[in-house]
Amino acid sequence: MSYESIFRHRGESYDFAMKKFPWVRDKEFQQLFSKIPLGKNEMILDIPALGGYLQKYCIENTVICLDFSKSINGIDVVSPYGKWPVKPVDRIVCLAAAHHIDDLYLFFNNMCDHLIENGIIHLADVALDSPISKFLDEFVGSNTSTGSHNGNYYDWNDVKYPTDLKVVNIENRPCPWIFESEHQMAEYCRFLFDLKNVKDKQILDALSNFVGYKNKEKCILNWNLTYIDLQSIRAKPASS
């Protein structure tokens, strides 16, 4: 199922989870810039942005939000492969959405079109054959309101990238989700993935079996993603 179809139905539930527990995925967002830190006054395109959650991690920069699905906000809706209503930006961020993109090569090429020369793409997503991919496709897919979750996962070292993009980093990084309790973790996942007709224990068992977590002073879910940094080496035409 496409990103547009999924979040047209599940966007409100996802946004509720992100806004009720806004700290849970701090590590996931912070890891985006761990290898190439942000400067000041950079223009950053967050796509797909859904509820615009990136802005609080980029307080000295301007974040432009676009999305692929009309759901919970007034953010402009665009195609992954078409012209976007923005001037070339310094950086583009795509977090945890690439596994819903059908033509990754075209998407990368389009992102390159919207970068300044030497601009950076920061992409992070679930790895091929990882425990998290199995959690999403098997448990979430069996219990979400949209009826399935069949992600397009990749070994990012084997992906064909446009020749105008230089691979700077490809790295699996831990980005644990942090909760106050098991109950909070189950509630968060219930809304984030719009899980229906499942009890907290079923969610916790699935998280334990697929992903793993520790429950001591904090409840820490062992989330991790592959982080990819790409740099545009496409020469921009000189101004006339």
Predicted regions and their residues:
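Short helix-loop-beta connector
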Residues: P37-M43
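A short SAM/SAH-binding and catalytic strip from SAM-dependent methyltransferases
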Residues: D90-Y105
